[in-house]
Each structure stands twice: as structure tokens, then as C-alpha cells.
């Protein structure tokens, strides 16, 4: 563990090494030398150096001493604000502590010898935070508590190590992206790369907690409230350093009770709660820290960037990415050199589909910290999402060069190679992922798929078997079944190599005919599948449509006025995200993040076409109502009620015709963009229509298959069927087991899955037919009934003939 005062001493040694003229300041030339020296692997241009120095000298202007330049306190502050990593820079410079240096430092001010001796002893006993001028120990009695606690922790660790109860997660530190959050206020050392898991159910741990309670009682018995606060904060920090997070939280909570308006205990409690996976409670503590910092004037102003960053990260832990973006932006505005804030902002923007903005933020982070592997990884992912694949490959490779075992970079680069059809290279990337993370089942599955794409069927089969050992997910069994079907097909081809053709041909839509009224038309199914895919990604079907009605009834939204003076209940995107979190509270954070990304890209981008960042809440409710859970008729009713809830219609039982037309065209623009976007252009050009529409008239407009949103009847059919399996039936084109509806060609008997039918794919064997007649079966039971009816009719006909 880092010793007391060592962090400040490291900064001092760095400062002394580059203060060439010993004038107590770092000039631009000296700062330039420092930046270059601590980034030995980076080749800076003169423009980059100049920009970095301009930013530093502007941000820390209060620490600039005339021509001398940046003072020692200024350099220390840059590290405190997260603009650099002290330990990394110290190691990069190859500086070592030695007895001569320590002796010289002590001799430089030999007065008050006894106090210096006492301080030197203190510095040998615990961590750097304790001697920080802003966040360290204030009272002498607190030192005694800290020393006693260190003995207790050491004893507990020794006993648990001896009994083999102490677990240390010794994962490859290169494998994962950095958390990027500020663990401390002011000078600190980060938690060890090795996560420690204490055995809390052991007898030794119980004894430790009991003895810890005695120390807490001593802190409570201090002579003043300030001293008690100092004691509990120090106890909490020591426990936090040793990764005893639950016990540390108790101490920080007690400190919060003693001084509710102090930023530090709330911040520390938030950190503990985040590590313990209690993201909502963590967010609440950071909000209290933010409130205290903002009301405390300039006293805590320099801590605001750290609070904003950690608040953003705790929100991401809940899946609230849009809200997190707001706080990362605030941190970056307050501290423009905070490269972690910029990186986190870029990553969050990527997470909600704002790729161009993500690229800009990530490039700024890399500009400030060129060896930031995580920023390179997310920048490459953003570039790939924008279609700049070759540049993305270069940036992914740069991330891997900086961190050879970077799992995210290796895995995502493998996915990029798969998209480009470079299967052999993809397989190599997934192999490297598995070398770092052997039980990464997705990498193992993707390796099998890439090997299959590369034509190495036997290797693919072995890789799939390995994946099955890691997990028993149904998609793996489908993949194995698919592989077997392909092998069967391959054997048939070998016996008839002269007529070997591609796996399918695409037939024009007019050649696909339907048998029976219940069989879905091919174009309708293609659109419905897209809507259903969006519905599944967003999990809106898990939100009962009645929950939308309750939101409208129970939560008041203030009325605002748009540019043309029309009253509206508009809301900012982050606030809308909070509402969606309530509606989709059953989703895990990572699933909710995916839902927000899809909603932001598909719905909010259309509703907020002006880029104001605000959305008409009533229209939003009406747009998502058709995809929520519940009976289709109820969904339509709630959509109509959402339009009634808008200020222009409130209090009435009817909506304006123009509002109804706008709604229908918005639905088509969002969910059927190939047909609907051109119609939206007409909406903005229409004159005001004061006529009104009843609910029944609204239903007629809604259900119109050509100009309305009648496609929802097909979507509802998919909702009820898309988990149906058809026994051993496989699609004649893709060879995957058929799930959902089965489309059987009545003349030749081949069957297609939903996807292949919607895309017009047929086996090349049947390409000579003039037309193809399909009957749709919801299940094999339905198919068997149809077959029995057919046999019965044939038998009956024969009897009559006789």
C-alpha cells in the first residue's frame, strides 16, 4: 500500500526533476519536457504540445507564478483533478526514493525537530490521504484509532490467509477497461488491481467486527463533534483501502450523520455503495455530495468534476446512459483536461447511438492522453458504427498495441472482421480473447461461426462443443443443429457436384402467392419483422400499456410553449429516460441500456427533429403504446388517450384531425421509414385543420392497411407465435430450426422460416417455377390438422368415385 505522504512526495520529485533553473516554477519549455518524458511511447507534434500547455496554463491560471510558470501546488492540483497519473508518470521517469533524498529533505528545514520526527513516524504508518491538507487526519487521537485499526486488519488478513478463506481475484489487469471513476477526493492511491474478497461468515471476521465496534465507540466518545467526524472518516478510509467496503460504508454513514453538509462522507459512501453494486443508493449519495458542494461556495468547487464523473458512472450502473452523459459533460466543462470525463462521455454517447458526438469526445480524450487504450477501443467501435471500417481496424490495433490483452478491443475487432467477411482474422481475434478469458462463451461461439465462414467445418464443430461446455443456452443448440444440417447438405452436393449452386436464390415479390386468408403477405411480414425486432430490443412488450395511463394520471408535467406558440408537455431526454426506467423496472441495467439506445436512435431522433433535446411527452406515449404489453384494442385506446392528454386536446373527448394525421404519419415515419419519411414532410406543410376526430374515427385511420398503421395486426401475430417451434422442421434455405410461423410451398413442399420468406429466398432446386404458393402454419399441430383434413377429403373423393 502507498505510504503516507508518498503521493505528494512523488509529485515533488517530478517537479524538482523538471525545474531546471530552480526558480520554483515550471515554464512552458519545462512543462513540455515533462509531458514528453512521461509519455515515452507517444510522438507529439508541436501543435499537440502547444494545445496541451495552453489548456493547462489556462485551467490552472491561479497557480501560474509570472514568468516562472506552474508552481508545485499547481502541478499537484493537476494530478488531484485527474489530469495525470502520478504513479504511472513516476515509474515512466524511473525515479526512485532513496535515503539521501529523504535525509536532504528533512535537513532543509531542521527547526521543530521533534514535530518532524513525529510526522515522519506518522508517514510510515498508513496511506497518503491521511496527510493531505484538505482530506487528511486533523486530530491526534484519530491517529491512535487508525493505528489500532491497522493492527486489527493485519490480524484478520493473517488469519484468513492462513485458513485459506481470503480470496484474491488476480485477473489479468490488461483484460478489462478501466472504471475511470474518481475513488478519492484529493490525493489518493487507487485500489489495488487485485480485488480482495473477505470471508464475512467466518468466526475471525465476527471478532474483527466486534473489535471494530469498540473503535467506533471511541470515535463517538470524542471531545467534540468535529473530532468524532474525523475519527469515523479515518476509520472508513482505512477500511476502504483494505477493500472492507461494507464496514467502510458504516463509518462513512456515521460521518454523514455528524456533518450532513460535508461533501466528503457522502462521496465516500457513494463509492462504497457503487463497489457493492448498489447503484441507486450510490447515485443518491453522490447527489447529496453534489448538493453540499454546490451550496458550499468555492470551498468544494474543485471537487465538482470528480463528483460529476462518479455520479455519471453510478447512473450508468443503473442503465441511465442519457442522464450519465449530462454529468460527464459538466465534468468536462469544469475541467477540460479531465480525459477520463471525456472518455466516459464518448463511451456513453456511443452507448446511445450518438456516434459522431462520441467520436469527437473520444478524440479529445486521446489528444489529452494518447496512450489511453480504452478510449482507442471505444473510438474504433464508434467508427465501425459509422461505417469507417478501415480506420476502425487501425484504431482497434492501436488499442491492442497499448494493452495487448484488452478483451473488449480483441472481441470487437473480431466482430468487425466478421462483418467484413474476413473470417480467418476474426477467428484469430477470438482465439486471443479466449487466451485471456478462457470461459468467454460468446467468443467461443463466434470463433465457431468464423471458422465455419472460413470453411473449416471440423474446427468449427470442435469450437461449438467447447462453447456448449461453457453454457447451455438454447442458441448454441440451434447452432449445432444448423451445423449438422449444413454438413448433410455438403454431402449431397459432393454427390452431385456438377449442379452445385448457391444456397438460395431471391425471387421477386410478385411470384409469391398466398393460400388462405390467414397467410401473411411477404411485404407485410418484412415490415412486421422489423417492428417486432425493435419491440424485442426495447422490451416495450414487458411494459403493460396500463402503466402508461398511470404515468399520465399520476405525474404532472408542466406546460411549455413551442416556437409557434402551441402549448405542449415537453420533457428533456434524460428526464424521459427516468420515466422509461420506471416503466421498464424489470430490466437489468445492461438490457435497459440497449433499450434506450434503440429508442434514442429510432424514436427520439424523429420526435426531436430540431435537435432541441426536448420531446413531446404525450406524442411519445402515443408512439410507444402500440408496442407495449396488453390487448391490441387496449393499446389503441391508450394511444388515443395519450393524444387527449396533450394540452391542445386536454379536457375533450376528441382530438383534432391534424393531430391524428400527424400521429399516424409519425408512426409510419418511425416504424416504416422506407414509406413514412416522405409522408412526414407533408405534415409540416399542412394548414391547421380545426375539425375533430372521435375514437371510432381514429380507429379507422389507425387500422387502415395502406395509409394507417394496420401492420400492427401482423406484429401482434408475431408476438403470439415467435417462440413456437415446429419439431424437427428446418428452413429449406438457411437450415436453421423454424421458430415462429412456417411457410410451406403447397406444390413442392419445401418450407421457409419467417425471415427467408420475408426476403423472398427459395432453394435453387425450385427456381424454374413460375410462381410459389405458400400456406402459413402457426404450429405443427395446425400443420397436422391441415394434413388430416387433406387426407380425409381425398379418401372421401375416392369413395364417391367407387
UniProtKB/Swiss-Prot annotation:
GO terms for cellular component: endoplasmic reticulum; plasma membrane. TPR repeats lie at residues 229-262, 264-296, 305-338, 339-372, 373-406, 407-440, 442-474. Pfam families: TPR_16. This is Uncharacterized TPR repeat-containing protein At2g32450. Gene3D superfamilies: EF-hand, Tetratricopeptide repeat domain. Keywords: Calcium, Repeat, TPR repeat. The keyword Cell membrane does not apply. Residues 6-41, 595-630 form the EF-hand domain. It comes from the Eukaryota. One of its GO terms (molecular function) is calcium ion binding. InterPro entries: EF-hand-dom_pair (IPR011992), EF_hand_dom (IPR002048), TPR-like_helical_dom_sf (IPR011990), TPR_rpt (IPR019734). The keyword Zinc does not apply.
Amino acid at each position: 500500500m502507498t505510504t503516507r505522504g508518498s503521493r505528494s512526495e512523488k509529485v515533488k520529485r517530478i517537479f524538482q526533476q523538471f525545474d531546471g533553473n530552480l526558480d520554483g516554477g515550471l515554464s512552458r519549455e519545462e512543462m513540455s519536457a515533462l509531458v514528453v518524458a512521461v509519455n515515452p511511447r507517444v510522438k507529439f507534434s508541436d501543435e499537440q504540445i502547444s494545445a496541451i500547455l495552453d489548456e493547462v496554463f489556462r485551467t490552472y491560471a491561479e497557480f501560474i507564478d509570472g514568468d516562472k510558470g506552474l508552481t508545485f501546488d499547481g502541478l499537484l492540483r493537476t494530478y488531484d483533478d485527474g489530469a495525470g497519473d502520478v504513479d504511472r508518470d513516476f515509474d515512466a521517469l524511473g525515479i526512485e526514493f532513496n535515503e539521501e533524498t529523504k535525509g536532504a529533505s528533512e535537513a532543509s528545514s531542521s527547526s521543530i525537530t521533534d514535530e518532524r520526527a513525529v510526522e515522519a513516524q506518522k508517514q510510515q504508518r498508513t496511506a497518503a490521504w491521511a496527510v493531505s491538507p484538505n482530506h487528511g487526519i486533523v486530530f491526534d487521537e484519530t491517529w491512535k484509532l487508525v493505528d489500532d485499526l491497522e493492527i486489527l486488519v493485519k490480524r484478520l488478513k493473517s488469519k484468513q490467509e492462513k485458513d485459506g478463506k481470503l480470496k484474491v481475484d488476480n485477473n489479468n489487469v490488461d483484460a478489462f477497461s478501466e472504471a475511470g471513476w474518481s475513488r478519492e477526493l484529493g490525493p489518493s492511491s487507487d485500489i489495488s488491481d487485485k480485488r480482495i474478497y473477505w470471508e464475512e461468515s467466518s468466526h475471525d471476521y465476527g471478532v474483527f467486527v466486534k473489535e471494530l465496534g469498540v473503535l467506533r465507540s471511541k470515535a463517538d466518545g470524542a471531545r467534540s463533534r468535529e473530532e468524532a467526524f474525523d475519527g469515523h472518516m479515518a476509520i472508513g478510509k482505512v477500511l476502504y483501502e483494505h477493500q472492507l467496503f461494507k464496514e467502510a460504508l458504516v463509518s462513512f454513514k456515521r460521518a454523514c450523520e455528524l456533518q450532513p453538509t460535508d461533501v466528503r462522507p457522502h462521496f465516500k459512501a457513494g463509492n462504497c455503495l457503487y463497489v457493492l453494486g448498489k447503484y441507486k443508493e450510490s447515485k443518491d449519495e453522490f447527489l447529496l455530495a453534489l448538493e453540499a458542494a454546490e451550496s458550499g461556495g468555492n470551498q468544494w468547487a474543485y471537487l465538482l468534476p470528480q463528483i460529476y464523473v462518479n455520479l455519471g458512472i453510478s447512473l450508468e450502473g443503473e442503465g441511465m446512459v442519457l442522464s450519465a452523459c449530462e454529468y460527464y459533460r459538466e465534468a468536462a466543462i469544469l475541467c477540460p483536461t479531465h480525459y477520463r470525463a471525456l472518455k466516459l462521455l464518448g463511451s456513453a454517447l456511443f452507448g446511445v447511438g450518438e456516434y459522431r458526438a462520441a467520436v469527437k469526445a473520444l478524440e479529445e480524450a486521446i489528444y489529452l492522453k494518447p496512450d489511453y487504450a480504452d478510449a482507442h477501443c471505444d473510438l474504433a467501435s464508434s467508427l465501425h458504427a459509422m461505417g469507417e471500417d478501415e480506420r476502425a481496424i487501425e484504431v482497434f490495433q492501436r488499442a491492442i498495441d497499448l494493452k495487448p490483452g484488452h478483451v473488449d478491443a480483441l472481441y470487437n475487432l473480431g466482430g468487425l472482421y466478421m462483418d467484413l467477411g474476413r473470417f480467418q482474422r476474426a477467428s484469430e481475434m477470438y482465439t486471443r480473447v479466449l487466451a485471456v478469458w478462457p470461459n468467454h462463451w460468446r467468443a467461443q461461439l463466434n470463433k465457431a461461426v468464423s471458422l465455419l465462414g472460413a470453411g473449416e467445418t471440423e474446427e468449427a464443430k470442435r469450437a461449438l462443443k467447447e462453447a456448449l461446455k461453457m453454457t447451455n443456452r438454447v442458441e448454441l443448440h440451434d447452432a449445432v443443429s444448423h451445423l449438422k444440417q449444413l454438413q448433410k447438405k455438403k454431402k449431397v452436393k459432393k454427390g452431385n457436384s456438377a449442379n452445385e449452386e448457391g444456397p438460395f436464390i431471391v425471387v421477386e415479390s410478385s411470384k409469391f402467392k398466398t393460400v388462405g386468408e390467414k397467410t401473411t403477405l411477404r411485404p407485410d411480414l418484412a415490415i412486421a419483422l422489423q417492428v417486432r425486432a425493435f419491440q424485442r430490443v426495447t422490451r416495450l412488450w414487458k411494459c403493460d400499456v396500463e402503466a402508461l395511463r398511470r404515468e399520465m394520471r399520476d405525474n404532472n408535467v408542466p406546460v411549455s410553449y413551442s416556437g409557434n406558440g402551441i402549448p405542449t408537455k415537453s420533457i428533456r431526454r434524460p428526464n424521459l429516460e427516468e420515466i422509461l426506467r420506471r416503466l421498464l423496472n424489470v430490466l437489468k441495467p445492461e438490457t435497459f441500456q440497449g433499450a434506450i439506445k434503440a429508442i434514442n436512435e429510432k424514436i427520439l431522433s424523429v420526435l426531436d427533429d430540431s435537435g432541441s433535446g426536448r420531446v413531446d411527452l404525450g406524442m411519445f406515449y402515443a408512439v410507444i403504446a402500440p408496442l407495449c404489453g396488453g390487448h391490441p384494442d387496449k393499446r389503441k385506446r391508450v394511444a388515443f388517450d395519450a393524444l387527449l392528454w396533450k394540452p391542445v386536446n386536454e379536457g375533450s373527448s376528441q382530438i383534432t384531425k391534424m393531430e391524428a394525421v400527424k400521429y399516424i404519419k409519425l408512426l409510419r415515419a418511425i416504424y416504416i421509414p422506407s414509406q413514412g419519411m416522405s409522408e412526414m414532410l407533408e405534415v409540416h406543410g399542412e394548414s391547421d385543420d380545426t375539425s375533430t376526430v372521435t375514437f371510432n374515427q381514429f380507429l379507422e385511420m389507425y387500422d387502415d392497411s395502406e395509409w394507417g398503421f394496420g401492420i400492427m395486426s401482423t406484429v401482434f401475430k408475431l408476438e403470439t407465435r415467435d417462440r413456437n417451434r415446429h419439431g424437427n422442421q428446418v428452413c429449406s434455405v438457411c437450415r436453421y430450426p423454424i421458430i415462429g410461423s412456417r411457410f410451406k410451398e403447397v406444390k413442392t413442399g419445401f418450407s421457409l422460416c419467417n425471415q427467408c420468406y420475408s426476403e423472398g429466398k427459395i432453394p435453387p432446386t425450385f427456381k424454374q417455377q413460375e410462381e410459389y404458393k405458400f400456406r402459413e402454419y402457426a404450429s405443427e399441430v395446425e400443420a397436422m390438422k391441415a394434413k388430416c383434413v387433406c387426407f380425409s377429403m381425398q379418401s372421401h373423393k375416392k369413395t364417391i368415385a367407387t
